[in-house]
Amino acid sequence: AITSLKYFSENAPGYHVIAAGSLLGIELHQGESFPVGKVDFLSLHPMSFIEFVMAMGDNNLARLLQSKEWNMITMFAPKFQELLKYYYYVGGMPEAVLVFSQSRNWEEVRKIQKGILNSYQRDMSKHAPSEIVPRITDLWKSLPAQLSKENKKFIYGVIREGARAREYEIALQWLQDAGLIYKVFNVKAPRLPLVSYEDRAAFKIFVLDVGLLGAMSNLKASTIVDGNSIFTEFKGALTEQYVLQQLILRYEPYYYARPNSTQEIDFLLQDDEDCIVPLEVKAETNVKAKSLRQFVTDNHSQKAYRISLNDYKQADWVTNV
């Protein structure tokens, strides 16, 4: 099917052909022939928070978010926080969003998410080399525990005691090629371009969707109505996953852990103006940001952002969003 696209490009250019495939990355890595230069790629991701708000029928609120009219946004903060709780639980997988928009039924949403996770397990067994299927499965199941650590750097020993990188590198690559995980590298130094300083041995792993992470972790729907506890579950794992999910739509995020120090910046971005922008993620309204302030001081950062439940505020060295 993939090779037929070359025919359409060369012999039937008047037709616009769209082809979809969930495991295309794996096929290409396995040496399948591909019509180079004949195909444009478009990566699809789970629905963003703004798209979720629109799917809930709140188009005016979605437009308000896009407008960045912060004074108005602050007035509707309780409503946005309610929708954000819903998004943490439902996530952005289209079928889960559709069912929730129609029924507001938490159990039906979870049933769909569990079905998606089961289909991923079947894909692992069907499409991955048989000798690495157990390692792929073990690695995949370890991700909630990886993200619930205080330090979210990926540790092979969390998969099983004594596990080593060489045993799981291929399994990790398979999950990445399948589009089931995002890999966020540490940078050895916060310098431009960030890609030149990435540390290939130090990274965080996130799953593709915050709702699926909740399903993998058996998060109960009761956390939705229990104050703001959903924002702090698993040491803020859902919050960091949520932020990553929005960033990945536009940027290639990194993070920075200063050597021989406790200083860590949750995400580093290289923006359109070639500025290095540090982001710190806070799951609550407690926004003490010692690491972020130190980073801004050391690197003379022009921009810095802190993501929290607090209202928008622009200070002299940081913007709270």
Enumerate the language-model features and the residues they cover.
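Interdomain motor-coupling "hinge/lid" segment immediately C-terminal to the ATP-binding subdomain
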Residues: 22, 28-148
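Structural motif
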Residues: 275-277, 303
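Terminal-proximal interaction/regulatory segments of ATP-powered molecular machines
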Residues: 277-283
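Conserved catalytic network of the ASCE P-loop NTPase/AAA+ motor domain
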Residues: 8-15, 33-37, 270-271
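Conserved nucleotide-binding/hydrolysis micro-motifs of P-loop NTPases
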Residues: 22-27, 46-50, 188, 212-213, ...
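Conserved catalytic/switch belt of AAA+ P-loop NTPases
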Residues: 2-25
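Catalytic cores of nucleic-acid endonucleases
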Residues: 283-320
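Accessory nucleic acid-recognition modules appended to NTPase machines
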Residues: 93, 98-271
